[in-house]
Amino acid sequence: MAPYSPPSSRGIARPVISAALLTLGALTLSACGSEDTAASVDSGAAATTTQVTDATGTKVKVPAAPERVVALSEMDLDASLTLGVEPVGLTAGRGQKGAPRYLADQAKSIPVVGAVTGPDIEKVVKAKPDVILAGQLADEQVLAQLRKVAPTVVTIDGTKDWKKSLELTGTVLGRSDEAEKFLAEYGTKAASLRTDLGSQAGASVSVARYSAKGTAVMQQGVFISDVLKDLGFERPGIQDDKGEGHSTPLSDENLDEIDGDWLFIGSLDAGTDADLLAELAKKPAYQQLGAVRDEHATVVDGTRWTSLGGAQAAVSVLDDIRKAMVK
């Protein structure tokens, strides 16, 4: 699998709510947000629709070939761009003002319509979507408001499995073939890397994120753990357990929890947090880690490794691991 180049493009807290909600009654007449909703209207003619089952089991009628997609999670944005569809709205990435750093160039012209904490309904309305990819949004009141704007599909289930989400997004966007092709190429690339790891296959790999709040490790049940599992790696200490949240904070006294045969550590912010990470590397407690002493510690882009993740992020992780571990 060559370095990823996306196909040509076409054009969970309560959200910010404003006077734009007054327009939703009119929008409801032309939106198709559930199995009981009429097909959407385009230039006076009924558009072709298809029914999909989202990550919650809800059946949703969506346009057969959506052209105005709003992506309400990093994984939705990653998937859409991977499949050759440029959204008309996105939510800012974790710790970012806009798209996740690794997608910034591809998404530089896409308006921000919300944050990790939730969508801004007014901005979603202004984007005039014909379908909304709602990520892992679980607030039923928010979902009801979004469904008045356009058909809304929850794309991420409780497992947060990026592969399942990509397949569902491919179905919603009419790009199932592209999704299947990507997953096949990813599988081939992962299998090749696993073979080339040689004696390092089965090593314990630690993944940590550093910020002004301190150090956190990535446990089971998140994106990066699934990618590492594809490669057959072990996880050290508490990282082999399922965490309660997206990441698990550590006190300075427990810094040894980030140790392993190999350590990959990153930050979300390329500015302040990256500077803090550079300072951490100078501390004796960090320098005493086995992975550091063995020169098995690598600084990575935290937006790829330690956030919600997605298809392009997964390929980047494989590339980083190959560069660090295959000699």
What are the roles of these predicted feature ranges?
Residues 141-212, 308-327:
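Extracytoplasmic substrate-binding proteins
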Residues 15-23, 32-51:
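Short, low-complexity, disordered segments immediately C-terminal to signal peptides
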Residues 96-99, 139-141, 157-168, 202-227, ...:
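Extracytoplasmic ligand-binding site segments that recognize negatively charged/polar headgroups
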Residues 128-134, 151, 255, 260-263:
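Proline-aspartate-enriched helix->loop->beta-strand connector
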Residues 68, 76-123:
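A short, structured surface patch at a secondary-structure boundary
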Residues 261-327:
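Structured C-terminal subdomain patch of bacterial secreted/periplasmic proteins
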